[in-house]
């Protein structure tokens, strides 16, 4: 059985979280570490935006600051995510890994099997979304809003037809980095408050639409699920779906210095976060 590293970082700053994901990609590309499954949280609660999003156009930055939220641009695509009551995961693995599909969409499905299995471990009837109409496929090419949980993409996880986990992917240096948010709870009004809308009517439409499109774990269970329970369920889910053994990984001081330098140079800088 192949051994991967497993890293549970706990609560970290937004800039450190993104720097560590990129550092893991760098080290794996250089053959210094095996593939990695990482779990983490955010301190403070943070709005992350996709690599291609326009921060000043899409985001109400005054509301972000007024609510004391962190803000960071991800190295991956996709739309904006409010990271608050959730567990975030990342998977770092070479594109040439055995049986890894070349297609971005199919690789996404393979890596997301661990998330699917994690939901099943929690006793939830989750399944992959597959856009089955021309309208849904068109929405993926030209999304109507900047909100990630507005609609599921190919092979994202849904329960009762509603999106419960959103993910994004990038490929650099021959390595896949996929990370995503697993929602425990969803504060709809806080989420809506940090986006710019063309009008109050547009915001009201999203307010009505969101409960039909997105759902969080604790709104579907009788007893609240903790982050610790999620860590166990999804760690075991990845181990089973990828048929791997997970070995705990702790960063060395030298590795921590590398992450902090990358954080300072890139993810903590306005030049990166507001460049579009």
UniProtKB/Swiss-Prot annotation:
UniProt entry keywords in alphabetical sequence: Acyltransferase, Transferase
GO biological process, one term: lipoate biosynthetic process
Organism: Lysinibacillus sphaericus (strain C3-41)
Residue ranges of every copy of the BPL/LPL catalytic domain listed in the record: 31-246
UniProt subunit comment: Monomer.
Gene3D superfamilies: Bira Bifunctional Protein, Domain 2
Name of the molecule in the record: Octanoyltransferase LipM
Gene of this entry: lipM
Known EC number: 2.3.1.181
PROSITE patterns linked: BPL_LPL_CATALYTIC (PS51733)
Lineage: Bacteria, Bacillati, Bacillota, Bacilli, Bacillales
Function: Catalyzes the transfer of endogenously produced octanoic acid from octanoyl-acyl-carrier-protein onto the lipoyl domain of GcvH, an intermediate carrier during protein lipoylation.
């Amino acid at each position: 059985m192949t051994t991967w590293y497993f890293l549970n970082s706990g609560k970290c700053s937004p800039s450190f979280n993104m720097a560590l994901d990129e550092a893991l990609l760098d080290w794996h590309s250089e053959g210094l570490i095996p593939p990695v499954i990482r779990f983490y949280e955010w301190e403070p609660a943070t709005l992350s935006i996709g690599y291609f999003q326009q921060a000043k156009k899409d985001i109400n930055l005054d509301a972000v600051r007024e609510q004391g939220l962190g803000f960071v641009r991800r190295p991956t695509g996709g739309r904006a995510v409010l990271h608050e009551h959730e567990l975030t995961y990342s998977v770092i693995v070479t594109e040439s890994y055995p049986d890894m599909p070349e297609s971005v969409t199919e690789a996404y499905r393979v890596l997301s099997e661990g998330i699917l299995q994690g939901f099943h471990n929690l006793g939830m009837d989750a399944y992959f979304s597959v856009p089955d109409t021309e309208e849904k496929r068109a929405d993926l090419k030209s999304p109507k809003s900047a909100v990630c949980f507005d609609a599921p993409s190919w092979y994202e996880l849904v329960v009762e037809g509603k999106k419960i986990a959103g993910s994004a992917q990038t490929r650099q240096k021959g390595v896949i980095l996929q990370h995503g948010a697993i929602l425990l709870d969803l504060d709809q009004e806080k989420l809506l408050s940090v986006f710019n809308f063309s009008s109050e009517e547009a915001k009201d439409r999203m307010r009505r639409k969101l409960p039909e499109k997105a759902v969080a774990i604790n709104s579907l269970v009788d007893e609240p699920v903790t982050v610790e329970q999620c860590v166990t369920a999804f760690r075991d889910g990845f181990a089973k779906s990828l048929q791997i053994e997970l070995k705990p990984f702790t960063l060395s001081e030298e590795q921590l210095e590398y992450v902090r330098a990358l954080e300072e140079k890139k993810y903590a800088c306005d030049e990166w976060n507001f460049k579009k």
